Amino acid sequence: MKKSVLALALCSLTALSSQAFAQQVQEGPWLVRVRAVHLDPANKSDPVGGTGATNRLTINSKTMPELDISYFFTPHWAAELILTYPQKRKVSLDGAEIGTFKNLPPTLLMQYHFTPGKAISPYVGAGINYTRISSVKLLNGTAQLESSSVGLALQAGVDFKIDKKWSLNLDVKKVQIRSDVNTAAGQLSAVKIDPWLIGVGVGYRF
């Protein structure tokens, strides 16, 4: 009796695994998306030089292109790498521009897709962001930003299938990006960029 139950359980697991594998093969393990993303920074910073609560640094909002490459290990689980080119950002102090910098923010996420293969497929993700900061031009060269930032990233989104390969996508991310502003005299301010990224795009599965 025990052998029969064990055999039945093994057969059931094999059938489920075969079904999941067949679905993945049918859709293909790779998904590439191109999105237009609006980046809206949180813009929280310490008062500059301790001069007062009103003297704060802000980073401008921006809409930018984004390339996302996902690999599905199973129909439900996927890893997504998010890429773009270095983005030029404006820095302001109490509304007056004081300089610019460029940032490159690749992000790696692990995703869970709730209804793979369905017409509407929502997902959530979590991972890590690495932001490389370069070409810093602040206060006529007298101030610098830290060259890199590592932080957490959270994601929620949904795919709307057009056919077996093409889909439309809506995606929202919250990313932790932080940096210190330094001068020769010491730290000028600590900035929490921590942006929301809201994107729409198209995906191709193969």
Indicate where each model-derived feature is located.
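Outer-membrane beta-barrel translocator domains and adjoining extracellular loop/strand segments
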Residues: K44-T51, K90-E97, I133-T142, D180-Q187
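Predominantly the C-terminal beta-signal and adjacent terminal strand-loop region
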Residues: K88-K90, D163-F206
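Cleavable N-terminal export/targeting peptides
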Residues: M1-G28
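Outer-envelope beta-barrel architecture signal
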Residues: S4, Q26-W30, P75-W77, K118-P122, ...
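Short glycine/proline- and aromatic-enriched beta-strand/turn motifs that initiate or cap beta-hairpins
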Residues: F21-D68, S134-S135
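Hydrophobic alpha-helical segments of small multi-pass membrane proteins
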Residues: P106-L108, G125-Y130, S147-V158, V172-K174
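Gram-negative (and chloroplast) outer-membrane scaffold detector with strong preference
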Residues: A36-D40, D68-L138, P195-R205
